[in-house]
């Protein structure tokens, strides 16, 4: 155990009193002293003023707190004085070898490394609350991966032309992919939608042929059918595609996500290889149903994310919901599958918007009859192998990961953002920082997985939580048990035979804070005059009288003490760097409340999460600096009055005006009589009357002019037919009366009609 402090075999904690006196012990003590020389005053006061009454509580306060286990240390004083930074404990007289101070270790086994792309494959970290550990993860892409490409095609009627194009893509695509892979395989599957109403027509005449509107013979609708497993035989792939018939449904969205999840999790059916780069090509021209859409058909059972293929047919299509985007993303990442959405038409942008929610996916727009399908696949694959991103899975409660990518060009990006334009000769580094704010309920040894998206290798991070002390682990005997029982409900219970006689006679004595309070606050049992607190599902109950707990503190955004502190006696005890009644505010936020004079909120308010809340209702402004009606408003700004008349002022005063009085508002004062004459109501009445009269008169004139103009045009149009009475000659009108007579004769008879001229006043008639 001594060697762990010197960087030799790792140990769970530094326990100096377990080492024998000698050079090793001296070096160990020197290491502890050098470790704590740089501690700040904030941690010093935090450890010393924490009122921690057990070693575990002390170590949970922060990475710099230590606990003195020496029996004679501060004899007669409060137990909380045993908790402090190591340098203070030593100065108070605690022997160096009696200080509990867990250390942080990162161990990377050099032997048995099997990974070739992601190294190291395993990392072992020992953490304590508030501490952080750091290591580098290296990712080196291979030059030529084996590639498994599975075509998942929407075979609804609108995709008829695109399916015909698939008959000829096999050989051409295989030739193009040979440049990137020496081992290329193809597979094929089809999907439509759930085979229930309202997604398909259940009319007896259309149940087996949904394409009657297209005058086509279609196969029955189906949720997902696995047609061909991954194979190197391109001819077999083309034959399977050639035999494929289209199907149909009646609503616009399809069941694509349902089929994608089955293609991802049914590894043995599809034939996914562990060592291959797995590509899932989804061809469609419509959107896909999302989770909860199935409720329209009365399907309410959530998707369980498991494989349900029977005879290559998805048999749970009509009984389970569509998967959610989060569930689909999880299954794709777990199975190292990259998705290429090949979309035709206006729905391309719908899939493009989903890319941030589905890591490792690419969307491309296919042309009419899928003319550019092969080029789309090749370009998408080039982009996928040139991107390196990681994701942390199986997070341990209370343990957080911060990942920063160091790209080959020197750029630093967040882990989820990753690096682009990476070649097979490049190496991408990821700086991984692991922190533990508090110990999880499970405790012990846990692990997390760092998984590069689309890679078949991972890095497993073993996390050992140093949340206890050796003094507690080696505790034994009645005396130790009685000493620790009130402080830790996990302490073994004392046997009745170990109790002193006087304690056995009054078992509840010492288990009440006051006589009128229940035994152990009603949340524990009294054993040997000491409270043993109950274990509760809500959290931990502790304290001498079980009066404290870690679950009755305020919540912030659904987390107890915002996840940045621990609950003690109903109050949040914030971790280092956080403050507030719910530990919701960073400590550094207080600097945003300081004005130019160094005052917090100008002395008129309090700083809450980096924002000033003015306590004086008359104060306004970001720093509560404006208070026009405050008694001190004039005295505070009196020196700025002379800045309003800058004539004959010295340069020093002018400089002061520019700096200190630049924000002063200069009000504009208008000189006016204090008394105003009463308005003349009679004058206002006449003005309104005259204006109204003139407007009405104007309307009448306009209407009159329109009527005259209309009459004039009417008279003019009838003047052509007016007969002048001055003419002596009578007007002779020529009238013509015709009648068509048809005779069936070989030689029609000629008829002569003589139309005489009639006077205008005579009546004209035709007699036949």
From Swiss-Prot:
Cleavable signal peptide: 1-42
PROSITE patterns with a match to the protein in the record: EGF_1, EGF_2, I_EGF_1, I_EGF_2
Cellular-component GO terms for this entry: cell surface; focal adhesion; integrin alphav-beta8 complex
Compartments, record wording: Cell membrane
Free-text tissue specificity from the UniProt record: Placenta, kidney, brain, ovary, uterus and in several transformed cells.
Extracellular side: 43-683
Membrane topology value: Single-pass type I membrane protein
Annotated GO MF terms: integrin binding; metal ion binding
Domain PSI: 46-95
Keywords: Calcium, Cell adhesion, Cell membrane, Disulfide bond, EGF-like domain, Glycoprotein, Integrin, Magnesium, Membrane, Metal-binding, Receptor, Repeat, Signal, Transmembrane, Transmembrane helix
Binding site for Ca(2+): 193, 249, 251, 253-254
UniProt main location, coarse: membrane
TM helices/strands, residue ranges: 684-703
Domain VWFA: 146-384
Domain I-EGF: 471-495, 499-547, 548-584, 585-625
Record topology, Cytoplasmic segments: 704-768
Highest taxon of the lineage: Eukaryota
Keyword Transmembrane listed: yes
One biological process term in Gene Ontology: integrin-mediated signaling pathway
Positions of disulphide bridges: 47-65, 55-469, 58-83, 68-94, 211-218, 266-307, 407-419, 439-467, 471-491, 471-494, 481-494, 499-528, 511-526, 520-531, 533-546, 553-567, 561-572, 574-583, 585-609, 593-607, 601-612, 614-624, 627-630, 634-661, 640-657
Family that this chain belongs to: Belongs to the integrin beta chain family.
Domain characteristics, as noted in the entry: The VWFA domain (or beta I domain) contains two cation-binding sites: the ligand-associated metal ion-binding site (LIMBS or SyMBS) and the metal ion-dependent adhesion site (MIDAS). Unlike in the other beta integrins, the cation-binding site adjacent MIDAS site (ADMIDAS) in ITGB8 is not functional due to the presence of two Asn residues instead of 2 Asp residues. This domain is also part of the ligand-binding site.
PANTHER family: INTEGRIN BETA SUBUNIT, INTEGRIN BETA-8
Function of the protein: Integrin alpha-V:beta-8 (ITGAV:ITGB8) is a receptor for fibronectin. It recognizes the sequence R-G-D in its ligands. Integrin alpha-V:beta-6 (ITGAV:ITGB6) mediates R-G-D-dependent release of transforming growth factor beta-1 (TGF-beta-1) from regulatory Latency-associated peptide (LAP), thereby playing a key role in TGF-beta-1 activation on the surface of activated regulatory T-cells (Tregs). Required during vasculogenesis.
Quaternary structure and interacting proteins, as annotated: Heterodimer of an alpha and a beta subunit. Beta-8 (ITGB8) associates with alpha-V (ITGAV) to form ITGAV:ITGB8. ITGAV:ITGB8 interacts with TGFB1.
Name of the featured protein: Integrin beta-8
């Amino acid at each position: 155990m001594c060697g762990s402090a010197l960087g030799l075999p790792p140990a769970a904690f530094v326990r100096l009193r377990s080492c024998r006196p000698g050079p090793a012990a001296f070096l160990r003590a020197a290491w502890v002293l050098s470790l704590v020389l740089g501690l700040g005053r904030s941690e010093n006061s935090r450890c010393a003023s924490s009122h921690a009454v057990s070693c575990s509580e002390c170590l949970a306060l922060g990475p710099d707190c230590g606990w003195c286990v020496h029996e004679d240390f501060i004899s007669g004083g409060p137990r909380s004085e045993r908790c402090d930074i190591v340098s203070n404990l030593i100065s108070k007289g605690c022997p160096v070898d009696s200080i509990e101070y867990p250390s942080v270790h990162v161990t990377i086994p050099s032997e048995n490394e099997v990974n070739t792309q992601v190294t190291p494959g395993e990392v072992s970290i020992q953490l304590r609350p508030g501490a952080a550990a750091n290591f580098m993860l290296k990712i080196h892409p291979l030059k030529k991966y084996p590639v498994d490409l599975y075509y998942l095609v929407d075979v609804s009627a609108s995709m008829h032309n695109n399916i015909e194009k698939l008959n000829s893509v096999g050989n051409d695509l295989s030739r193009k992919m040979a440049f990137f892979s020496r081992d290329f395989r193809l597979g094929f599957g089809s999907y439509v939608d759930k085979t229930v109403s309202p997604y398909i027509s259940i009319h007896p005449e259309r149940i087996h042929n949904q394409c009657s509107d297209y005058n086509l013979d279609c196969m029955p609708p189906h949720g997902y059918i696995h047609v061909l497993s991954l194979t190197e035989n391109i001819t077999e792939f083309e034959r399977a595609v050639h035999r494929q018939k289209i199907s149909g449904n009646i609503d616009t969205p399809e069941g694509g996500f349902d089929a994608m999840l089955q293609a991802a999790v049914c590894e043995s059916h599809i034939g996914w290889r562990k060592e291959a780069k797995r590509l899932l090509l989804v061809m469609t021209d419509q959107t896909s149903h999302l989770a909860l859409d199935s409720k329209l058909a009365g399907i309410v059972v959530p998707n369980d994310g498991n494989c349900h293929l029977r005879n290559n047919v998805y048999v749970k299509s009509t009984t389970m919901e569509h998967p959610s985007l989060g569930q689909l993303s999880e299954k794709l990442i777990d199975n190292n599958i990259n998705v290429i959405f090949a979309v035709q038409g206006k729905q391309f942008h719908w899939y493009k918007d989903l890319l941030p929610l589905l890591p490792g996916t690419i969307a491309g727009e296919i042309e009419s009859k899928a003319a550019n399908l092969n080029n789309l696949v090749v370009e998408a694959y080039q982009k996928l192998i040139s991107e390196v991103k990681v994701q942390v899975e199986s997070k341990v409660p209370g343990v957080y990961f911060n990942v920063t990518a160091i790209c080959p060009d020197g750029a630093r990006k967040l882990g989820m953002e990753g690096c682009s334009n990476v070649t097979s000769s490049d190496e991408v580094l990821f700086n991984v920082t692991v922190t533990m704010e508090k110990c999880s309920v499970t405790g012990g040894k846990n692990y997390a997985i760092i998984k590069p998206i689309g890679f078949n290798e991972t890095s497993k991070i073993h996390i050992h939580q140093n949340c206890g002390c050796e003094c507690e682990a080696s505790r034994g005997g009645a005396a130790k048990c009685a000493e620790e029982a009130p402080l830790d409900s996990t302490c073994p219970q004392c046997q009745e035979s170990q109790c002193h006689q006087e304690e056995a006679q009054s078992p509840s004595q010492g288990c009440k804070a006051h006589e009128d309070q229940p035994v152990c606050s009603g949340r524990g049992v009294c054993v040997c005059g000491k409270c043993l607190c109950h274990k509760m599902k809500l959290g931990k109950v502790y304290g001498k009288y079980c009066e404290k707990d870690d679950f009755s503190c305020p919540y912030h955004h659904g987390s107890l003490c915002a996840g940045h502190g621990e609950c003690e006696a109903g109050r949040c005890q914030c971790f280092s760097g956080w403050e507030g009644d719910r530990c919701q505010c960073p400590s550094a936020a207080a600097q945003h409340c300081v004005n130019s004079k160094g005052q917090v909120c100008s002395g008129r308010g309090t700083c809450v999460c980096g924002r000033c809340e003015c306590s004086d209702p008359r104060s306004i402004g970001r720093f509560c600096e404006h208070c026009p009606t405050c008694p001190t408003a004039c005295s505070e700004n009196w020196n700025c009055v002379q800045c309003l008349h800058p004539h004959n002022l010295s340069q020093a005063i002018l400089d002061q005006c520019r700096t200190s009085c630049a924000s002063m508002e200069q009000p504009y004062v208008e000189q006016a009589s204090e008394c105003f004459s009463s308005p003349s109501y009679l004058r206002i009445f006449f003005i309104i009357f005259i204006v109204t009269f003139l407007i009405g008169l104007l309307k009448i004139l306009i209407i009159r002019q329109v009527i005259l103009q209309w009459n004039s045009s009417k008279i003019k149009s009838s003047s052509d037919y007016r007969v002048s009475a001055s003419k002596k000659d009578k007007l002779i009108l020529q009238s013509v009366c015709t009648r068509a007579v048809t005779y069936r004769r070989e030689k029609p008879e000629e008829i002569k009609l003589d139309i005489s001229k009639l006077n205008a006043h005579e009546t004209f008639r035709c007699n036949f």
